[in-house]
Amino acid sequence: MPPKGQELDDHYFGTIRQRVASYMKDVNEELWKLGVAAKTQHNEVAPAQHELAPIYAEANIAVDHNQIIMKTLKKVACEHGLKCLLHEKPFAGVNGSGKHNNWSITTDDGINMLDPGKTPHENVQFLLVLACILKAVDVHADLLRESAADPGNDHRPVSYTHLTLPTN
């Protein structure tokens, strides 16, 4: 394989196959019934890999949504005669499933504490909050490592939430 080996633009920029589109439609309908809305779905880089991104929610709700999504993906895949692989690295050298949550910090009035200002004066708040986050990561690095250390994370770089389906 070349250095990255996954420059499969024909898949990434291609249209979603009809069988997969039908599956994704049914997944969306099931998720709506459960109160989970997805805003993005498209092909991903690896063969037969697709992304589904839920709409932003509070952290505890977003984590629950991710669990519901994974269960729904597998259930609906079976109904369509498909197999949904959610492993971080199902095959050597090929992207796998990256399940993660993004986070932000806002005040009660809706001010985004991680929004860089447009002027040096407005940027002070962002720099202070960022410095505090970096200090916390430094002080609690052992706890962060323990919370993320598992065999799956040993074999994957940072990635995004993916759905992997067969190509046929």
Name the predicted role of every residue range.
Residues M1, D9-G35:
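Carboxylate/His-rich catalytic cores and anion/metal-binding grooves
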Residues T15, W32, H65-L86, G93-N95, ...:
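Catalytic or ion-translocation cores adjacent to nucleophile or general acid/base/metal-coordination motifs
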Residues N43-H50, K89-S97, E146-Y160:
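A glycine-rich phosphate-binding loop feature that marks nucleotide/adenosyl-phosphate handling sites
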Residues M1, K99-T107:
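Short beta-strand elements
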Residues E58-A62:
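The substrate-binding groove and active-site-proximal loops of carbohydrate-active enzymes
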Residues L34-V36, A48-L52, H80-L82, S97-N101:
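Structural beta-strand/beta-sheet cores of well-ordered domains, especially the beta-sheet scaffolds
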Residues T161-T167:
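Conserved small/polar residues in nucleotide/adenosyl-binding loops
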Residues M1-H11, H42-L52:
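Residues forming anionic-ligand binding surfaces in small-molecule and nucleic-acid pockets
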